[in-house]
UniProtKB/Swiss-Prot annotation:
Its main location: cytoplasm. GO terms for molecular function: peptidyl-tRNA hydrolase activity; tRNA binding. PROSITE patterns: PEPT_TRNA_HYDROL_1, PEPT_TRNA_HYDROL_2. This is Peptidyl-tRNA hydrolase.
């Protein structure tokens, strides 16, 4: 069993924002597998998919981005999922829109959702998929990440969401390092 957490903020006003690209990836997986979302007792929404016989628990924390670890850690404990079977999907300002990067470990890189998860799981050594949203040319980052993708960027972000979902489906049957090597070359 694997836990796939997409990071974002709950609520209609954040639904299509750059910061919610993690939610968009797990929503894509839920859509592909036609599985419903259910409210979890751990302050998140969960959906279960089966890929190649492997059960994957999808989660969207409802804690708001900066407290994502408050949802992830209890779910790991409840389902007895070890850290090596967890994947966190989140937005990355340092990658261009449409690019994805898979990593097995690393720092939070200034991302508050990742800081919260690292604090709660007490390690930086877990799988992650970073989805590029680019940096603003000027202005505050907070307004930028809480803004929607402009029309010109939508084809690139849709492709990145689909590629991220493909990588997660591959991970059901393939070690993460192999999935990482495959998708980081594209």
């Amino acid at each position: 069993m694997k836990l796939i957490a997409g990071l974002g903020n709950p609520g209609k006003k954040y639904e299509r924002t750059r910061h919610n690209v993690g939610f968009m990836v797990v929503d894509e997986l839920s859509f592909r597998h036609q599985t419903p979302w259910k409210k979890s007792k751990f302050n998140g929404m969960t959906s279960e998919i089966i890929v190649g016989g492997e059960k994957m628990i999808l989660v969207k924390p409802l804690t708001f981005m900066n407290a994502s670890g408050e949802c992830i850690r209890p779910l790991m404990d409840y389902y007895n999922i070890p850290i090596e079977d967890v994947v966190i999907v989140y937005d990355d300002l340092d990658l261009p829109v449409g690019k994805i990067r898979l990593r097995q470990k690393g720092s939070a890189g200034g991302h508050n959702g990742m800081k919260s998860i690292i604090q709660h799981v007490k390690t930086q050594e877990f799988n992650r998929i970073r989805v590029g949203v680019s940096r603003p040319l000027k202005g505050e980052v907070i307004h930028y990440v809480l803004g929607d993708f402009p029309k010109a960027e939508q084809p690139d972000i849709i492709a990145a969401i689909q590629k991220s979902a493909d990588a997660i489906e591959d991970y059901a049957q393939t070690p993460f390092i192999e999935v990482m090597n495959k998708y980081n070359q594209k």
